[in-house]
C-alpha cells in the first residue's frame, strides 16, 4: 500500500476514534441483527492472547425480549435498592423502554486469574472495536456496567452458565442526538519517559 494511502486511512481512523460519543438518546428504530452480526464479525479481530475467543452475544430488540429484559433489570434494581420508590422504578423502566436494542456481551471466566484477565481485556477490546465500527455506520452505543453484571439471578434470566458473566450491557440504536465533545486531559500530562 502506498504511504499516502496509509496516512489517509490513519486520518479516517483517528477521526472516528476522536468523534465517537456514548449515545443515550436514540430514535426508536432498532438496528437490524444482520448489521450487529456484520460488525461483530469485524470486531472479533481484537487482540486475544491464545485466541480463546471467550465471548458470546445476546441481542435483545424484540418487544417481548425488551419487556423481559426491562422486568429483569427492574427486579434487580428493586432488590439492590429496597427504598426505591415506585415512581423512580417506573422512570427507570421508561428509560430502558426508550432504548431500541440491548447487546449483552458475555464471556467465559477462566479459573486461571491471568487467563481471566486476558480474556476480559480481549472482550473489552472487541467492545471498543464494535463501538468504532458502529459509529462509522451512524449507529450509537453506550457501554453500561455495574453490579447488575454480577447478579446470579440476572445471569439465570439470560441463560448464562456457571463459568460465564457479563462483560457489558450495550445500549444500541440510531442516535437521536449526540453530546458535545468532552475536554480530555492532554496525554503529555500522563506520559513518562525513562
From Swiss-Prot:
GO MF annotations in UniProt: oxidoreductase activity
Q: Which InterPro entries match?
A: NAD(P)H_nitroreductase, Nitroreductase, Nitroreductase-like, YdjA-like
Coiled-coil regions listed in the entry: none
Alphabetized UniProt keyword annotations? Flavoprotein, FMN, NAD, NADP, Oxidoreductase
User: Would I find Oxidoreductase among this entry's keywords?
Assistant: yes
Q: What is its EC number?
A: 1.-.-.-
The protein's required cofactors:
FMN
Give binding positions for FMN: 20-22, 147-148, 188
Describe the family membership recorded for this protein in Swiss-Prot or TrEMBL. Answer: Belongs to the nitroreductase family.
Mind telling me what this protein is named? Putative NAD(P)H nitroreductase YfhC
Amino acid at each position: 500500500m502506498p504511504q499516502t494511502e496509509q496516512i489517509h486511512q490513519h486520518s479516517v481512523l483517528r477521526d472516528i476514534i476522536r468523534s465517537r460519543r456514548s449515545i443515550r438518546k436514540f430514535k426508536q428504530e432498532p438496528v437490524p441483527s444482520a448489521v450487529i452480526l456484520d460488525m461483530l464479525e469485524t470486531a472479533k479481530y481484537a487482540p486475544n492472547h491464545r485466541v480463546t475467543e471467550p465471548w458470546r452475544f445476546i441481542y435483545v430488540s424484540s418487544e417481548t425480549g425488551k419487556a423481559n429484559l426491562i422486568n429483569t433489570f427492574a427486579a434487580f434494581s428493586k432488590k439492590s435498592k429496597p427504598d426505591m420508590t415506585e415512581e423512580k422504578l417506573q422512570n427507570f423502566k421508561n428509560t430502558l423502554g426508550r432504548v431500541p436494542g440491548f447487546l449483552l456481551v458475555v464471556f467465559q471466566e477462566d479459573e486461571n486469574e491471568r487467563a481471566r484477565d486476558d480474556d476480559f481485556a480481549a472482550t473489552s477490546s472487541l467492545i471498543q472495536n464494535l463501538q468504532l465500527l458502529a459509529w462509522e455506520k451512524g449507529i450509537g452505543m453506550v457501554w453500561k456496567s455495574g453490579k447488575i453484571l454480577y447478579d446470579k439471578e440476572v445471569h439465570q434470566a439470560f441463560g448464562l452458565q456457571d463459568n460465564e458473566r457479563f462483560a457489558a450491557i450495550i445500549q444500541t440504536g440510531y442516535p437521536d442526538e449526540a453530546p458535545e465533545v468532552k475536554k480530555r486531559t492532554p496525554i503529555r500530562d500522563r506520559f513518562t519517559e525513562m
